[in-house]
Amino acid sequence: MAILSHTLGFPRVGLHRELKKAQESYWAGNISQQQLLETGRELRARHWQQQKDAGVDLLPVGDFAWYDHVLTTSLMLDNVPARHRSGANESDIDTLFRIGRGRAPTGEPAAAAEMTKWFNTNYHYMVPEFTLGQQFRLGWTQLLDEVDEALALGHRVKPVLLGPVSYLWLGKVKGEAFDRLSLLPALLPVYKQVLGELAKRGVDWVQIDEQALVLELPQAWREAYREAYQALQGQTKLLLTTYFDSIRHQLDIITALPVQGLHVDLVAGDDDLTELHRQLPAEWVLSAGVINGRNVWRADLQSWFEQLRPLLGKRELWLGSSCSLLHSPIDLSTETQLDEEVKSWFAFALQKCAELGLLRAALNAPDEANQARLGEYSAPIRARRHSSRVHNPEVKARLEKITAADSQRQQPYAARAALQRARFKLPAWPTTTIGSFPQTTEIRGLRLDFKRGRLDGGHYRTGISEHIKQAIVEQERLGLDVLVHGEAERNDMVEYFGEHLDGFVFTQNGWVQSYGSRCVKPPIIIGDISRPEAITIEWARYAQSLTAKPVKGMLTGPVTILCWSFPREDVSRKTIARQIALALRDEVADLEQAGIGVIQIDEPALREGLPLKHSAWQDYLTWAVEAFRLNAAVAQDDTQIHTHMCYCEFNDIMDSIAALDADVITIETSRSDMELLETFKEFDYPNEIGPGVYDIHSPNVPSEEWIVELLRKAAQRIPAERLWVNPDCGLKTRAWPETRQSLANMVTAARKLREEQP
């Protein structure tokens, strides 16, 4: 039985972010819809051919998305909220953009759908909305159209379909409460129709993604898999696909399903190959996810060869990426500025495809020559274990000296709050922003010219100073109470700090999609982390010199830097987080010395870092909270520590949020209509909180009345004297006109509420 290779998906955006540029040009009216669609066709054709050339046998089709693959599935099922239909019965690409962004070149603007994290990754999906008695039908035929494209190009295709149970799990009920699982019978006929259409096209295998199986599901949801797959059997072979964690706790359900194969993530999970082989039906394909789709490290092919070799000839075996390569940069060969030793440690999406081909060849013909190739390929991995670039004895020594007292503020919140009120004398309903202001073309050009040597340091600092001054003037004019310097010097909230810390390296083209057209270029943590010199002090001190109002020092927290970087795999995540916390602890002390009295330590990724299995949460939360406190606790009691979190649901981790002991927490609540605040019915949050009052991910300007309504709703759950008024996230991606108007409405709303107070 010859072993086949496949990937679960490929990056969509293009090596040079061609999709992002086309999307944004279309939204701005600079290119036609036809030109946008043509860009998508070109990217798909290129990516299929690149995977094939690298050694992938079965090509994923349906992994491409114009905004998000969950949103694509919603349109396929005609699950379009009424507010986004804009009078049209049939969906088109603008329908999709209205759901994702709140507006599109055609149709009426409407509130965008809620966006949240994709499992425990830094990718975001658009949350499906479900209503009581909802019906589904085959609407958007993107998957079928793209299968036709790939077949016309002569490719051996494996369509990718988000499974029905996971789709329901990922959504939310809107309106009258009901069990969304009750929609499964209405959903299955559309899935059957899609599978039937694929069968008509001669499709042999369909990859049906049921990522929810890695979770610890309620029994009703486990049983739903039986109902779903009994209904879907018989038209094509189904590869039940799981990833991001182990599935051994679900094998009793999985092995009873009428599918023909199972894909298991052997990188993120700890499933045992021998045990999987023993428990799976003998006729099933076992797809081994051995190439890490979520990180950039070269795979130890020699080790995987030894683990997989005992299965040769015993069952049909496929080799795959652990998950979609969506989470990986595209091509390492374009990185011309990386040190050659460090570069030899990495593999990006195309190199990962080649790894699959190399391992497949060795397993199909396990002769000495092929095994020697594996050994040669894996040599840099062994060399890295002893590299001086990786290990710093001083960092290890400092970690060993940490005590419990290092993560404790001097006094409890109530005593600190009294000192802070006396120091800052802020009004009721104090207003602030989250940190960043619009990153204009001028700002980006200034940074780029400096980075490429076209601008000297003096002129660069002068330029950045002018933008900081403009940000302070704008905020003073608007009447905000606690100001920010605007972060003109920062390209990305994680990359900026990584550039100033030892232990990180950076890429030129290592872009990955975050959501929609938003791409990020995560740093890579290659070794022990330390701070060689102060990072933010110069700009914070300058901004504070321009105003009598407090200006926040802005730091990215240790857990977020960890989660939004490609981490090391040779030490624990806890160890990495503590190293970052110690480095940034020194930055907090330096900010205080520079006269900064309000310091924000952003942790938007705190929930994202949670293990997928609830039983493993407490261990993670213990060290994540400790890392934040280790970072912050050096501050004096009259220094106000803020933190910010976004895209999150906190109802089930409120104890840990409170344990951070931040004086003020700002959170994303606008897209979910303050839904998060429902948790305060049960949980008496002790400190101050700023529920985000408008959605910065949409260009729509919130009305003063809308903001007042949200704040009144918040005041029903949290005492008004502990409420702050702020957007739900930074304003980096917005334009100045909408930013000014939105903030003006926000400040006016806060003043109105102050006037209403007795």
UniProtKB/Swiss-Prot annotation:
It comes from the Bacteria. Its EC number is 2.1.1.14. Zn(2+) binds at H644, C646, E668, C729. Keywords: Amino-acid biosynthesis, Metal-binding, Methionine biosynthesis, Methyltransferase, Repeat, Transferase, Zinc. Coiled coil: none annotated. It is an enzyme of class 2 (transferase). The active site is at H697 (proton donor). 5-methyltetrahydropteroyltri-L-glutamate binds at R17, E18, L19, K20, K117, R518, C519, W564, E608. Binds 1 zinc ion per subunit. Catalyzes the transfer of a methyl group from 5-methyltetrahydrofolate to homocysteine resulting in methionine formation. Belongs to the vitamin-B12 independent methionine synthase family. This is 5-methyltetrahydropteroyltriglutamate--homocysteine methyltransferase. It comes from Sodalis glossinidius (strain morsitans).
